[in-house]
Design a protein with these regions (language model features):
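N-terminal lobe/hinge region of extracytoplasmic solute-binding protein
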Residues: 66-115, 146, 214
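Aromatic- and charge-enriched surface segment that lines or borders ligand/interaction sites
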Residues: 109-154, 172, 178, 269, ...
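Gly/Pro-rich hinge or "lid" segments in bacterial periplasmic/extracellular proteins
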Residues: 72, 98-102, 192-255, 264, ...
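Detector for C-terminal structural segments
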Residues: 29-50, 225-229, 234, 301, ...
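Surface-exposed binding/hinge segments that line
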Residues: 123, 157-202, 218-225
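N-terminal secretory signal peptides
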Residues: 1-25, 50-51
């Protein structure tokens, strides 16, 4: 049956043929408009990748993963990736964005977008059951969307889905839901894979997933001990099939073992064969990469990313309410030095905008130079001729963030900044990450340039900063341009809007970002089927042990 194409696909194909967009950008945008990945890949002149042969996989065994085991209550409130890497084996998402930033249907069979991008039809996969035997259906989807949009839940999804309200979600049938958007949005399918976007069982969920861990995923929870371990057990009736035609997953069990945030014991454990896989989603992996990159007993998979470490300043608190002070501190970042010493040069320099050169919308912009004398002058103009004492909060488990802070402290001194670095355990930093006036926060990879701005640099319908707006920076012109960009499909027109967005954030924004990082997935050789993902998400249903 021939796929029904969105009206914009023809124009996208024309732009691709004229060289106005890359092959990857073409595949990405056409799949967002509902074209299957196989069809989009064929249109781009490529062969669709083949799956593993049935004879190459082996069933059974236990995978041991070193990962923090945090307290888990409401999935919509997740602000760490590591608990989602455990819970995503139990509950699932409507879509899946792969390591190449291509978005596929998952619990959805497919989707269609209207020509104006304001009506999205979500067709649910049939025959899927939660692990307690309940059918997965449209009631689960409507219930979960309403959880995301409930201000009392406090989910970051509410800010990302600002184009929706409770009246926007229509149940058409047991397996179809329509979204009626207030304004156009191209990235809806990508938003549905934001890591707090796990689908919930509307019959059993009452706010605490561990108390009622019913999901559609390939595993069930056998043991969950905060700070110790999470043990997952294979379910036998999972909906998805493996290369051998039988129900996934291949493994019998997965054990996530909390080894703290010190990298040394984890490196020793994987070298000794006590651990099979290292989860770096919430801890920096540079030390392990340096120690293990030449080790013949492990696989090191690398991914370039849009992930960064953000020097963030709360604009509702002095002295950061004065843009001259913010600009002064940003000028104290010696970016080349910070990247080289904090992250071994494994990444790209940042430009104080939360849009990466890897984002398809990115508009090339000058990288600010280290200029402590200009910074000193700005401080004097702001009323601090004798300099300024500030506290900088950082999580001690991110070694590259600690080094970033130490280099900044040294290089900001000539400008008059006297920085007191306040280190604390990562868990303590996450408890207050939106509250400290000055800190360095890790921000995960997002495939499209509008996603983080929608999460972190806008206000809600009343102008109040959204849940993840840790700096409280809300700029009317920036917000209006972002809304415009969200509804613009033409890549060149979208990039022109981003030129304005980036200029505003660089000149009067609330963050510095010295670098974008590469990431690694490290596993023992017997672990097969692991794929590098720029967000460090772990999809383990089709992983096996040789």
């Amino acid at each position: 049956m021939k796929e029904k194409m969105h009206s914009a696909v023809k124009a996208l194909n024309s732009d691709f043929q004229k060289g106005k967009m890359t092959r990857r950008e073409f595949i990405r945008f056409t799949t967002l408009l509902g074209v299957s990945a196989a069809a989009a890949t064929q249109m781009a002149g490529l062969a669709f990748p083949k799956k593993a042969l049935a004879g190459s996989v082996k069933r059974g065994g236990t995978l041991k993963v070193a990962a923090p085991v945090h307290k888990v209550t409401h999935p919509a409130q997740f602000s760490w990736i590591s608990p989602t890497n455990q819970m995503r084996q139990v509950a699932e998402y409507l879509t899946y964005t792969d390591g190449d930033n291509i978005t596929h249907p998952y619990l959805l069979e497919n989707w269609q977008a209207s020509d104006d991008l304001k009506t999205w039809t979500l067709n649910l996969r049939k025959g899927v059951k939660h692990n307690n035997g309940d059918d997965f259906n449209a009631d689960d989807v409507v219930f979960t969307f309403n959880q995301w949009l409930d201000k009392d839940v406090g989910s970051s999804m509410k800010g990302m889905l600002s184009y929706l309200d409770a009246g926007s979600i229509e149940k058409v049938s047991d397996h179809q839901v329509k979204l009626h958007l207030k304004n156009p949005e191209i990235a809806v399918p990508e938003h549905l894979f934001h890591y707090p976007a796990m689908l919930l069982n509307h019959r059993t969920f009452e706010g605490d997933f561990i108390k009622a861990p019913q999901g559609t995923g390939p595993y069930t929870i056998e043991t969950y001990l905060e700070g110790e371990r999470c043990v997952l057990k294979r379910r036998n009736d999972y909906w998805n099939k493996g290369a051998d035609g039988k129900a996934l997953p291949y493994l019998d069990k997965i054990e996530f073992i909390d080894m703290g945030t010190e990298m040394g014991p984890m490196i020793a454990a994987i070298q000794a064969g006590e651990i099979d896989l290292l989860d770096f989603s919430d801890i920096g992996g540079t030390e392990a990469y340096q120690a293990l990159k030449d080790n013949a007993a492990v696989n090191v998979l690398a991914a370039t990313t849009n992930q960064t470490r953000v020097l963030r300043m709360r604009v509702d608190m002095k002295p950061w309410s004065d843009n001259r002070v913010r600009s002064a501190l940003k000028l104290c970042q010696h970016r080349e030095k910070i990247l080289a010493l904090a992250y071994f040069g494994q990444g790209m320099e940042g430009q104080d905008v939360h849009v990466s050169p890897k984002h398809p919308e990115y508009c090339p912009i000058d990288t600010p130079k280290y200029d402590p004398m200009q910074a000193k002058q700005l401080l004097a103009e702001a009323g601090y001729p004798n300099g300024l004492d500030v506290n900088l909060a950082v999580g001690s488990g991110w070694s590259e963030i600690v080094r970033y802070a130490e280099i900044l402290k040294q290089d900001a001194a000539p400008a008059g900044f006297r920085i007191n670095i306040q280190t604390m355990p990562n868990s303590q930093y996450w408890e207050k990450w939106t509250e400290v006036d000055l800190g360095i926060t890790t921000w995960a990879h997002r495939p499209v340039g509008t996603m983080v701005p929608s999460l972190a640099y806008v206000g809600d319908e009343n102008g109040k900063p959204v849940a993840w707006n840790e700096t409280r920076w809300v700029d009317k012109e920036y917000s209006e341009l972002l809304t415009q960009a969200n509804g613009t499909l033409d890549v060149e027109a979208r990039r022109k809007i981003f030129c304005k967005l980036e200029k505003i954030q660089q000149e009067r924004g609330s963050i510095g970002n010295a670098f974008w990082i590469n990431v690694w997935t490290i596993s023992r050789k017997p672990v097969q089927g692991v794929k590098a993902h720029p967000s460090l998400y772990l999809k383990l249903d089709d992983v096996w042990m040789s």
